[in-house]
Amino acid sequence: MTNILSPEKSENDQELPIRPSYLQEFVGQQQIKENLSVFIKAAKSRNEHLDHTLFYGPPGLGKTTLAKIISNEIGGNFKSTSGPAILKVADLAAILTNLEKNDVLFIDEIHRLNTAVEEVLYPAMEDFELDIIIGEGSAARSVKITLPKFTLIGATTRLGLLSNPLRDRFGIPMRLNFYNTEELKKVLNRASKLLDIDLTDSGSEEIAKRSRGTPRIALRLLRRIRDFAAVEGKSRVDKEVSDFGLNRLEVDRIGLDSNDYRYLKFIADNYNGGPVGIETIAAALSEQRDALEETIEPYLIQIGLLQRTPRGRVITIAAFEHLKMSVPNQSHHQFNIFNENE
């Protein structure tokens, strides 16, 4: 699923010039920032490595950025990979044996590591040792390699898919939450200065309100609205220009786009609001289940338009109202929603 409101990283998201490098530059996630600052200062004062850290939550909220910030704050090198990229134990061994003291190893989508790789990672995280088998058959022998004290930072959008043994080995688990409008305005204002965009307060607020609580989306929308402003001969991005650009991009007043409407209308039209299983929805919309669960559903749940129940997905009365549709058997629909969540 690719669209302007996808929180997933795109090749067109050129974030390097505006990506913050240190905690004091990072906007939002205040409690996480404050706690990380304490943990980093404490580790440096003891001349120890920072405990392994796990960032989890919806995509586009700053997990990769925070990992790079930690690397900068502790003064180590930053090495980045992803769960799907580590196919074999040998792949992981090659990465680990090239680390130096205080390096940060960032593994994105860490929930997608295979079991064999995970088992090798356990002693590396706990004891900073790598146990590998050299040779085959009767000539095979185990070799133990001592690793430097490094910090592993894992990132996942699917905490429930992370195995318990791996999850328990992270000393610092942190959940990233959606941003509010004021926080997104600060993100946009900071970016507009770095990108030399004349962004007014009203223009910033209009973009922020329609960015699904996600900085990555807000920054992407800012770039596209800048394009509309340039072509329309507008030197300043105010509310009118922002509204014009967002309407052209088919982003409505609460941040929904055509994919969200397809999702909600399918449940409303075909199942009277639900419940309906996610596999049925995915098949009907010709989308992958993961794409729906990671890209569309989190925001719909966050703003109260969707509920997940044991029997399936149910859209709320607020969703019917936003779609300008009548609620079928309203009292019965409300009762079922609450009943399923008991």
UniProtKB/Swiss-Prot annotation:
Annotated region Large ATPase domain (RuvB-L): the residues are 1-179
* Chain positions covered by the region annotation Head domain (RuvB-H): 253-342
Q: Which GO terms describe its molecular function?
A: ATP binding; ATP hydrolysis activity; four-way junction DNA binding; four-way junction helicase activity
Q: Which UniProt keywords apply?
A: ATP-binding, Cytoplasm, DNA damage, DNA recombination, DNA repair, DNA-binding, Hydrolase, Nucleotide-binding
Its recorded reaction(s) are: ATP + H2O = ADP + phosphate + H(+)
Where is this protein primarily located? cytoplasm
Q: Where along this sequence does the record place binding of DNA?
A: R289, R308, R313
What Enzyme Commission number does this protein have?
3.6.4.-
Q: Write out the annotated subcellular location.
A: Cytoplasm
User: Looking at the keywords, is Signal present?
Assistant: no
| List of residues binding Mg(2+) | T64
Q: Can you quote the domain comment?
A: Has 3 domains, the large (RuvB-L) and small ATPase (RuvB-S) domains and the C-terminal head (RuvB-H) domain. The head domain binds DNA, while the ATPase domains jointly bind ATP, ADP or are empty depending on the state of the subunit in the translocation cycle. During a single DNA translocation step the structure of each domain remains the same, but their relative positions change.
By sequence similarity, the record places it as follows:
Belongs to the RuvB family.
State whether it acts alone or in a complex, and with which partners, per the record. Homohexamer. Forms an RuvA(8)-RuvB(12)-Holliday junction (HJ) complex. HJ DNA is sandwiched between 2 RuvA tetramers; dsDNA enters through RuvA and exits via RuvB. An RuvB hexamer assembles on each DNA strand where it exits the tetramer. Each RuvB hexamer is contacted by two RuvA subunits (via domain III) on 2 adjacent RuvB subunits; this complex drives branch migration. In the full resolvosome a probable DNA-RuvA(4)-RuvB(12)-RuvC(2) complex forms which resolves the HJ.
Protein name per its UniProtKB record? Holliday junction branch migration complex subunit RuvB
Q: Which organism is it from?
A: Rickettsia rickettsii (strain Sheila Smith)
